[in-house]
A protein has these predicted regions:
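Metal-ion/cofactor- or nucleotide/acyl-coenzyme-handling active-site neighborhoods
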Residues: 1-272
């Protein structure tokens, strides 16, 4: 495994004026990014970059390949070639194969079709931080790690909305609420910047309108309102679950006949 020390990582990344983490989201505005940022910016892409790229990327770039139990996801899904064709030349820094939980395994450098591959183990950093029973997203893990490196360049997060779109979904294995709270606090502390309108708090105007009200009172009132709205939403969700009970029963019946995935077969084999 090609594991680097924190000092080596810092030396590698300190040459860039900006480190831009690009989420696989429709919220990414590439035209704005490329027009506002200098050529010395490094763009960090994640896994299936075809979600945000339509053509080969011209500029400094690095690809973060997330690991699963069978190794890097793009490796065991045979997507390495499909992903790497978006990058070429000396401006491509290569692949960073990361793992964020003990169940995830690295892939060997030779599995990335000749691209320079480095490995980054973030399990210890996230072990006592992330909520139990959930797994951190690659973007969150990389943002936290980069902030801890204390690089001279600015760290920018593009498209980190945690919102489901008509085209791409968000996965329930991640704690999106925790990540958004953490990242926005990070942004307001100045450790990172978030592009896409999430830097400004929609409740900041309340503090200006009620200057004599302590911030904790404003926060508690907002939490009270949100709690009531969540309670009402849960009631509607319960009703929806009841209405769709028969549909889910039919779906579960036919799901039993669905062929097992390569991952499921691999896990069964490892348990024997």
């Amino acid at each position: 495994m090609n594991l680097l020390t924190p000092e080596a990582w810092k030396a590698l990344l300190s040459r860039y004026s900006h480190i831009v983490l690009v989420a696989n989201s429709e919220a990414v505005d590439f035209e704005r990014l490329r027009s506002e940022l200098p050529e010395t910016a490094l763009y960090v892409f994640f896994n299936n970059v075809y979600k945000v790229l339509d053509e080969p990327f011209a500029g400094h770039a690095v690809l973060v390949a997330r690991s699963g139990v069978m190794g890097a996801n793009i490796v065991h899904r045979r997507e390495v070639g499909d992903v790497l064709h978006f990058f070429a030349g000396d401006d491509f820094l290569g692949v960073i194969n990361i793992r964020v939980s003990p169940e995830e395994n690295f892939s060997e450098e030779s599995r990335f079709n000749g691209a320079k591959a480095r490995h980054l183990d973030l399990t210890q950093m996230l072990g006592d931080l992330y909520p139990q029973g959930k797994i951190a997203t690659s973007g969150f893990a990389m943002a936290l790690w980069l902030a801890d490196l204390q690089l001279p360049g600015k760290i920018l997060l593009a498209g980190f909305s945690a919102k489901r779109s008509e085209k791409w979904k968000v996965f329930d294995v991640h704690d999106w609420t925790f990540e958004q709270i953490f990242l926005r606090l990070f942004a307001r502390m100045g450790s990172i910047s978030m592009l896409g309108g999430v830097d400004a708090s929609p409740y900041s105007a309340l503090g200006k309108r009620f200057p004599n009200v302590p911030p904790i009172e404003i926060a508690m009132t907002a939490a009270e309102v949100l709690s009531e709205r969540l309670h009402n939403a849960n009631g509607q969700i319960d009703r929806l679950m009841s209405v769709t009970k028969s549909i889910r029963a039919i779906e579960n019946f036919f799901r039993r006949f669905k062929p097992k995935t390569r991952k499921e077969r691999y896990l069964e084999k490892t348990k024997k």
